[in-house]
């Protein structure tokens, strides 16, 4: 399966290969079950299992800094994990002061990912995301990230070509 190919290509068993919420309407449970069968991990089933703060949320929020957004989310949803998307090391520095549970490192090259992982060591967990393919996942995994998320596991997986010939 596509998920199994990503898990093998990562060549780092302790790192989670995560799916995303990008699923076919009405097929989410089956597509996510297929990811697990292939050795991947379901990241989130819906918007209800974690707080993910992304760039669009911050643009619309208008409440100040990224760190303030994390603090507000933690006060409003104390039982949920908080994950923040960053795409620069400067954003990461600011976010780390608010102590999120996870940071999503979006569209970062392996060297930048390595630096980000080092900055997060002993603090929050790290997830690499954005444009990760079968040919790039091993280099991304080698940076030491805790997880890699791949939307293609659910939105672009190709069905197996099955056929059945019946002879009478």
What residues fall within each predicted segment?
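Acidic/glycine-rich phosphate/pyrophosphate-binding loops and surrounding catalytic core
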Residues: 1-87, 91-98, 102, 111-119, ...
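Short secondary-structure boundary segments
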Residues: 107, 130, 152-153
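Short acidic, glycine/proline-enriched helix-loop-strand junctions
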Residues: 122-125, 167-168
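Cys/His-rich Zn2+-binding cysteine-cluster or related metal-binding knuckle/ribbon modules and their
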Residues: 134
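Short, charged, intrinsically disordered terminal tails
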Residues: 152-168
């Amino acid at each position: 399966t596509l998920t199994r190919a990503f898990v093998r290509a990562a060549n780092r068993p302790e790192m989670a290969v995560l799916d995303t919420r990008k699923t076919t309407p009405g097929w989410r449970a089956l597509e996510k079950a297929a990811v697990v069968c292939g050795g991947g991990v379901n990241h989130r089933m819906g918007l209800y299992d974690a707080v993910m703060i992304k760039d669009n949320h911050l643009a619309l929020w208008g409440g100040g800094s990224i760190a303030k957004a994390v603090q507000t989310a933690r006060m409003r949803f104390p039982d949920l994990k908080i994950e923040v998307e960053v795409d620069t090391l400067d954003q990461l520095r600011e976010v780390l002061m608010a102590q999120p549970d996870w940071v999503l490192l979006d569209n970062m090259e392996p060297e930048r990912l390595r630096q980000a992982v080092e900055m997060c060591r002993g603090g929050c967990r790290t997830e690499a995301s954005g444009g990760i393919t079968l040919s790039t996942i091993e280099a991304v995994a080698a940076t030491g990230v805790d997880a890699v998320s791949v939307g293609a596991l659910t939105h672009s997986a190709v069905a197996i070509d099955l056929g059945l010939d019946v002879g009478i």
